[in-house]
């Protein structure tokens, strides 16, 4: 018995040492491990937000073509795509782009889905859904009007606009929403009551002759167990190197976690509980430059680029220790990054 116990103890120690070496390799900021992006799923119509469930299924929002054809699909571990919920509001924005669904989260068999066009939070019980089942129309889902509360709220800097974009669960079961239109974080209590946790400040205008501050445009939110981390896009003209990650306390106090980014569109927590952010693209003379998206790991002292060359990525979700899923809005794909 003692020999068997000793062998098991030795095996546990070896596994622990191997795990530590893997962590050390991953967290080497001076020489981060090389990672690549591979095609995981294709043929999606404007894929944006991602959520991974305990079975390894990937739930993804598709903005659609602007003709009320937004949908939520599920991707099985072998990369097959199945529609789950269809007919979400989708319109053509003043910029000529399709707009509608934002991000989603999965919790205990329920999807929480945001739509910035109709200003609603949708709740879908997918606990019994099996890939291949007939999809449901969005009109059958329970929904809650969030935008009316946001637009009526007397913000100190009031845009009089709402664009529900990203969300995350926080302490006490609250759901926290990054509103890219109002530049704010909205709290929805477990009973559905709404309040404002924090307003996300703009930045000084760095352009010649620019006087009005540039909006923060919060695009991503995560809770690391102590505080919220919020990624920002920054408004037009999307100045290079001016986007930030803000940290927001549970009481709503806002401060800069790290700056020096460009056009951030999503944020995830890495295996060390530090933020990994997604750059949409670098601004160019003709707008955002294709294939200039990147993934960056950030600490309070350093930003480390993990991968470049992504084509207009929009969402990121962690899959495993050093593996992520990323959507490509332009290519209609979900990529596996590892």
Regions found by a protein language model. Give the residues of each.
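Beta-rich, blade/repeat-based domains predominating
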Residues: 43-55, 69, 90-110, 150-175, ...
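Short, solvent-exposed loop/turn segments at conserved positions within beta-propeller repeat blades
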Residues: 64-69, 116-117, 180-181, 236-242, ...
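Residue position within the beta-strands of beta-propeller blades
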Residues: 59-62, 113-114, 176-178, 229-232, ...
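Bacterial N-terminal signal peptides that target proteins for export
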Residues: 1-8
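Surface-exposed loop and turn segments in beta-propeller and other repeat-based domains
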Residues: 82-96, 132-159, 194-212, 255
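Post-signal peptide N-terminal segment of mature Sec-exported envelope proteins
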Residues: 28-52, 73
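Bacterial Sec-dependent N-terminal signal peptides
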Residues: 2, 13-38
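Flexible "stalk/tail and boundary" regions
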Residues: 23-24, 38, 68-86, 100-111, ...
């Amino acid at each position: 018995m003692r020999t068997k116990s000793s062998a098991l103890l030795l095996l546990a120690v070896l596994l622990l040492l191997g795990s530590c070496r893997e962590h050390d390799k991953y967290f080497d900021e001076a020489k981060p491990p090389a990672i690549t992006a591979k095609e995981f799923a294709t043929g999606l119509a404007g894929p944006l937000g991602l959520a991974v469930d305990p079975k390894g299924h990937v739930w993804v929002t598709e903005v659609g073509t602007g003709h009320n054809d937004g949908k939520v699909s599920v991707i099985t571990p072998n990369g097959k795509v199945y529609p789950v919920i269809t007919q979400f509001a989708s319109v053509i924005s003043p910029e000529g782009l399709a707009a509608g669904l934002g991000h989603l989260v999965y919790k205990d068999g329920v999807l929480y889905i945001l739509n910035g066009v109709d200003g609603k939070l949708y709740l879908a019980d997918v606990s019994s859904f099996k890939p291949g089942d007939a999809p449901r129309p969005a009109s059958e889902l329970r929904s809650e009007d969030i935008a009316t509360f946001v637009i009526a709220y007397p913000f100190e800097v009031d845009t009089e606009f709402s664009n529900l974009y990203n969300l995350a669960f926080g302490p006490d079961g609250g759901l926290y929403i990054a509103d890219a239109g109002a530049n704010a974080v909205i709290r929805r209590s477990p009973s559905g009551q709404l309040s404002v946790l924090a307003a996300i400040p703009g930045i000084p205008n760095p352009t010649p002759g620019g006087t009005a501050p540039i909006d923060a445009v919060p695009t991503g939110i995560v809770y690391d167990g102590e505080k919220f981390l919020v990624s920002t896009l920054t408004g037009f003209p999307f100045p290079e190197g001016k986007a930030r990650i803000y940290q927001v306390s549970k009481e709503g106090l806002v401060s800069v976690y790290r700056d020096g980014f460009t056009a951030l569109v999503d944020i995830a927590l890495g295996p060390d509980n530090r933020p990994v952010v997604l750059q949409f693209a670098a601004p160019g003379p003709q707008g955002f430059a294709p294939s200039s998206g990147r993934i960056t790991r950030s600490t309070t002292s350093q930003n480390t680029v993990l991968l470049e060359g992504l084509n207009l990525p929009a969402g990121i979700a962690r899959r495993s220790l050093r593996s992520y899923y990323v959507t490509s809005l332009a290519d209609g794909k979900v990529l596996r990054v590892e």
